[in-house]
């Protein structure tokens, strides 16, 4: 009887620990210093299995005017998700220009495409960003987190 009670208590504790850990494993939240970067789509070119979207916007944090090109590749059978690569060019009022390599994954729900991107800038800065593309409104909005 004593072993049965201990076994039951042990299984209950194990179940609670598992449920606690599984909830935190499924959640992915980024915290820390960040800034907003907002863009307007200037063109959208469709190809079989991919789309190329160009956009531009003014971004703080010393970036200035930013031009983006993203090539979205469809990798799912339903066409609702995939990966992307891209390039960014920035120029500030003083004429300093920077280049960036962009890469990540995306998923679409209705008119909204959610992007998760890792970017490498020529000045050595690396950023993680989560973005939302509104295909109907023609906008891109990112929360950018510099990586230390």
Which positions does each model-derived feature cover?
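Beta-strand-enriched cores of mature, soluble protein domains
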Residues: 25-148
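Bacterial N-terminal signal peptides
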Residues: 10-22
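N-terminal secretory signal peptides that target proteins for export/translocation
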Residues: 1-7
